[in-house]
Amino acid sequence: MKFYVVALALLVAFVCIAESRSVETERAVDADLEDDLDDLEEYLEGIAEALELEDFPDTEEARGETFDKLKEKLKTFYQKLVEKAEDLKGDLKAKLS
C-alpha cells in the first residue's frame, strides 16, 4: 500500500511539472526538469525513509511469507470445518435413524 502511495505521488508530481511548463527553449526546459527531478527524487527518498520502504524487496518477501502462512492456516481451518461438518452429518443421520 505504501508503495502505491509513493508511486501516486510520483505520478502527480510528473503531471504537475508537465502542466506548469510554459513555452521555453528546449535547453531551459531540460535544465528546469533536471532540477525539478532532483528535488522530487530527494523528496521521494525522504518519504520512502519515513515509510521505511528503502528495503522494499524485503518487504515484498515478508508479505509473501505472511501470505503463505495465512494460506496454510486457512487450509487447516477448512479441513477442520469439513471434518466437523461430516461429524455433524453423521450425528444427524444417527438421530434420524
From Swiss-Prot:
Residues 1-22 form the signal peptide. GO terms for cellular component: extracellular region. A motif (Processing quadruplet motif) lies at residues 60-63. InterPro entries: Latarcin_precursor. It is found in: Secreted. It comes from the Eukaryota. Residues 23-63 form a propeptide. This is M-zodatoxin-Lt7a. It comes from Lachesana tarabaevi (Spider). The lineage of its organism: Eukaryota, Metazoa, Ecdysozoa, Arthropoda, Chelicerata.
